[in-house]
């Protein structure tokens, strides 16, 4: 039985307050807030599947629509002939084609060694007339701009990696960054100039606290010794003196 329905349970009959009509909007608002918060927290890393659902692009690309046989009637003959050829001959042909593609004619070394001056003169002659050198500064500028645009992307990716995966409510980014920073440990052999200022202050503070604690313990010990010396031995006839009072009366 939902609160909005007209049917009332025994609990609703007995406890009439609070009224549903008054507090229904508040309840629904809180429900919506909880749902939105859950969605925010769970949407930090969505898992994208390659083949999700029957109508995915991978399925559509993998299985194209079958074409009619009449349209593909003419090229069917060469394909049948290719199938008749043995597999070994096809493999040999493919290997020969790959070798021909990979092997390129190397330039003769003698020509390159004998004519370095000719190349230099050609480059100097073609510099003012050819459009190639004029385009080089623009290409360099374009490369510089690409590098400049890539650098902020890398920095943003680093920032995203350092961020907490969940959206923490009530916490700012500065506090999160402060929490992820490393602390500076102080070695006894390190000089004052090599230590971070905050770590040096913390070290001095701890040393002062240790001295205070040592002084307090010494004072308490001396007070206990003085009390033990002053206290007179209690008589064993006192019925109200317990063993605890007899042993620990100096601290009371």
From Swiss-Prot:
Q: One GO MF term, please?
A: microtubule binding
Comp. bias intervals (Low complexity): 54-64
BP GO annotations: cell division; mitotic spindle microtubule depolymerization; regulation of embryonic development; regulation of mitotic spindle assembly
Short motif ST]-E-Y-X(3)-Y motif 2, span: 242-248
Query: Residues where N-acetylmethionine occurs?
Result: 1
Query: Compositional bias of type Basic and acidic residues: which residue ranges?
Result: 108-125
Residues modified to Phosphoserine: 65, 191
> What Gene Ontology cellular component terms go with this record?
axon; axoneme; centriole; centrosome; ciliary basal body; ciliary transition zone; cilium; mitotic spindle
Annotated region (Disordered), positions in chain? 49-163
What does this protein do, in the record's words? Answer: Plays a role in microtubule (MT) stabilization and this stabilization involves the maintenance of NUMA1 at the spindle poles. Colocalizes with polyglutamylated MTs to promote MT stabilization and regulate bipolar spindle formation in mitosis. Binding of CCSAP to centrosomes and the spindle around centrosomes during mitosis inhibits MT depolymerization, thereby stabilizing the mitotic spindle. May play a role in embryonic development. May be required for proper cilia beating.
Listed PANTHER family: CENTRIOLE, CILIA AND SPINDLE-ASSOCIATED PROTEIN
**Family membership noted in the UniProt record:** Belongs to the CCSAP family.
The record's note on quaternary structure and interaction partners says: Associates with microtubules; the association occurs on polyglutamylated tubulin.
Q: What is this protein called?
A: Centriole, cilia and spindle-associated protein
